[in-house]
Amino acid sequence: MQLLSSCYLFNGLSESQLLRLSAITKEEQMRKGHFLMHEGQVAEALFVLKEGFIELLTAVNDDFELPIAILRNPGDCSGTSSLVAPYEYSLSARCAEDGTLFVIQQADLKHLMLKDHELGCTIMKNLAQHLLERLKETRQELKIHFKTLFKSSHN
């Protein structure tokens, strides 16, 4: 339960809410090289890292995937596309080493969120804040790339 509380999605949940969340959470072993999800696939689960590394990838073309990030801290999560329409994973996730993760099925989490609106609002608020931070980071990266491109084209 403590690991779930370290996941940004579940910040601010009460102990009783975390207990209900842990009741729908399953611990699974992950093997190096195994894909947890594929970009464009129907998003059916949320994954919370317990131990190991998960590499997040996006397809550039048919034979090349670009690494976007590595989840390495206990409590890091992926699969938040399972909470937002159109419910398709926006990235692929591959286990970079053997480890353990918690899996929460989308249907179970949505049911819990509908039963406990406060829990649902907290999770969605945390998701919105996280996505806003990611948007800001992406905007900063674009500025850097644009400046570099602009400088190189004017030299």
Which residue ranges define each predicted feature?
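Cyclic nucleotide-binding regulatory module and flanking cytosolic helices
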Residues: M1-E27, R31, S82, S153
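Cyclic nucleotide-binding regulatory domains
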Residues: H34-E97
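A small-molecule sensor/coupling module
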Residues: Y89-S90, D108-L149
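A short, charged helix-loop
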Residues: L101-F102, H111
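Helical coiled-coil/dimerization "stalks"
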Residues: L149-N155
